[in-house]
Amino acid sequence: MKKIIKVEAVEKHFGNQVIIPPLSLDIKEGEFLTILGPSGCGKTTLLRMIAGFETPTKGNLLLDDEKINDLPPYKRHMNLVFQHYALFPHMNVEKNICFGMKMQKVPAAEQKERAEEAMRLTQLLEFRNRKPAKLSGGQQQRVAIARAIVNNPRVLLLDEPLGALDFKLRKDLQRELKNLQRNLGITFIYVTHDQEEAMSMSDRIVVMNKGHIEQIGTPKEIYNKPKTLFVATFIGENNIVKNGEGYVAIRPENVKVRSVEEPILKEYHLGHIEDIEFVGNMEKLYVRDEKTSELLMAYQTAEEAAQWSIGDNVYVGWEQEDEVTLN
């Protein structure tokens, strides 16, 4: 797949503070790439440099192999969608969507045709004459997205666009955004701190921490094969266990809990259940390993967990193939 954007040893300093140390990243044409990390990790700063709202202190940004460090945002063929929609309150949906085209003096007939298609893709046709105050938060976000795609950008940049929405609406819009990206075939670069959001939508995820890239991979690679201690603790839940000079990670769904009356494998240790948590379709057991004193998490179905009570002695263990060695 062709690389549309290249970030080459880019740094960002604010005064004497280094926000992003040298960082390199290739972004493929037509992919849904998510930059994921905690607050303050540099993900939004990186997005703003790609968009042209911040200038790299060092290094180069390339679009189609052409340097764009000093190219103004409006010449980059990219559009940016924020968490706060910045819609014009006195304009209806259709006029909000057409505003950018009007400023570019796009012929009126073409404006209408392109706005019609953008509203169709974002399910806004029935709301075309409504003003923002008459729309829900999700509908307003759809208008912001329609306004961003109507100019046919090469790249759509999204900075935590669903952060202000409630859980169900956020889930609905996640599916819509992914379907929209597939239909348009353009590159989406999405910034979020929400790991579930990143996992459900992305072709690839860039995990950032303190300005560094910790790992790049598909959602399955990031979840099943975390490379670093940070990724293992930030993405989902993991049991982190000391192993010689380093650590291994074991997902709770791979930890087995057995009765002390069963024949047991030598790799299993004696432990006792300290707590049981109901987590929807599963129950989470907290088991104290008597040998290592580690507190281990294990997921079980409600039916499996029904046999246990807090304080029960059990055997706890896992298959060696389920261990992931961490850097």
From Swiss-Prot:
It is a peripheral membrane protein. It catalyses: ATP + H2O + polyamine-[polyamine-binding protein]Side 1 = ADP + phosphate + polyamineSide 2 + [polyamine-binding protein]Side 1. SUPFAM superfamilies: MOP-like, P-loop containing nucleoside triphosphate hydrolases. GO terms for molecular function: ABC-type putrescine transporter activity; ATP binding; ATP hydrolysis activity. Its EC number is 7.6.2.11. InterPro entries: AAA+_ATPase, ABC_SmlMolc_Importer, ABC_transporter-like_ATP-bd, ABC_transporter-like_CS, Mo/tungstate-bd_C_term_dom, P-loop_NTPase, PotA_ATP-bd, Transp-assoc_OB_typ2. ATP binds at G37, P38, S39, G40, C41, G42, K43, T44. Its main location: membrane. GO terms for cellular component: ATP-binding cassette (ABC) transporter complex. Gene3D superfamilies: P-loop containing nucleotide triphosphate hydrolases (3.40.50.300). CDD domains: ABC_PotA_N. Residues 5-235 form the ABC transporter domain. Keywords: ATP-binding, Cell membrane, Membrane, Nucleotide-binding, Translocase, Transport. It is found in: Cell membrane. It holds the Pfam family TOBE_2. It comes from the Bacteria. The complex is composed of two ATP-binding proteins (PotA), two transmembrane proteins (PotB and PotC) and a solute-binding protein (PotD). Belongs to the ABC transporter superfamily. Spermidine/putrescine importer (TC 3.A.1.11.1) family. Part of the ABC transporter complex PotABCD involved in spermidine/putrescine import. Responsible for energy coupling to the transport system. This is Spermidine/putrescine import ATP-binding protein PotA. It comes from Bacillus thuringiensis (strain Al Hakam).
